């Protein structure tokens, strides 16, 4: 079944700051979507709303026309929305397997079987029994992704995912995200990096000062035009 995520008139106001100003967007599975903007554009607030960390002051979120009440991260998980934050939410002194088992519902043996199936399917390779603190940034991110995949997500949101990755780790991430997309997972990619948007994503929504100012197909965009939309003026060449 195709996945349709619709954000309708979302607003969030903090003292002295309109973080999200009547934001409406629609995403469908089969594509990778970018949410692009400078720091302070409103991306992080919208991500926190979609992941249930905070609630909007106004507006609604629909998944396949079901009105989601995202009052907590648990609500997002129940509705098959997976989230990989920029700063990894892992227990450094615990092993990879111990981290993955925290939210698991099956016994350890069954869980290891499922994890190994994911490893084989996506060509992941991580020692399950080493402490997380011994992993590279790219490996830690894979642990977060695996944790999401264990819940069979319909939506996977990646928040500034390449900020601490090497070039090789970034390439590996892109390959994985394209595979997830091909399998029907709706991917929302949060970033301020223009070249990544053009090389990975199918559509891009540009945010500025809490508003969505542009939605377009990336094949029709260039770095310069996206940069102009981000800052709200034509940049000098």
Q: Can you name each region flagged by the protein language model?
A:
Residues 2-237:
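Glycine-rich phosphate-binding loops of nucleotide-dependent enzymes
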């Amino acid at each position: 079944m195709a996945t349709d995520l619709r954000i309708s008139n979302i607003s969030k106001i903090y003292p002295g700051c309109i973080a999200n100003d009547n934001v409406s967007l629609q995403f469908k599975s089969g594509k990778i979507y970018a949410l692009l903007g400078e720091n302070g554009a409103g991306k992080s607030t919208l991500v926190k709303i979609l992941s249930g960390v905070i609630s909007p002051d106004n507006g609604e979120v629909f998944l396949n026309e079901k009105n989601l009440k995202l009052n907590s991260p648990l609500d997002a998980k129940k509705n098959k929305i997976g989230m990989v934050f920029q700063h990894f939410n892992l227990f450094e002194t615990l092993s990879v397997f111990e981290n993955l088992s925290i939210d698991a519902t099956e016994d350890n043996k069954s869980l290891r079987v499922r994890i190994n199936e994911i490893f084989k399917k996506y060509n992941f390779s991580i020692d399950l029994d080493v402490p997380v603190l011994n992993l590279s940034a790219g490996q830690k991110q894979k642990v977060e992704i695996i944790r999401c995949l264990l819940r069979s997500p319909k939506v996977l949101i990646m928040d500034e995912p390449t900020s601490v990755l090497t070039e090789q780790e970034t390439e590996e991430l892109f390959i994985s995200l394209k595979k997830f997309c091909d399998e029907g997972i709706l991917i929302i990619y949060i970033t301020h990096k223009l070249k990544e948007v053009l090389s990975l994503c199918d559509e891009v929504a540009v945010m500025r000062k809490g508003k969505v100012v542009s939605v377009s197909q990336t094949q029709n965009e260039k770095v310069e035009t996206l940069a102009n939309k981000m800052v709200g003026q034509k940049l000098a060449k």
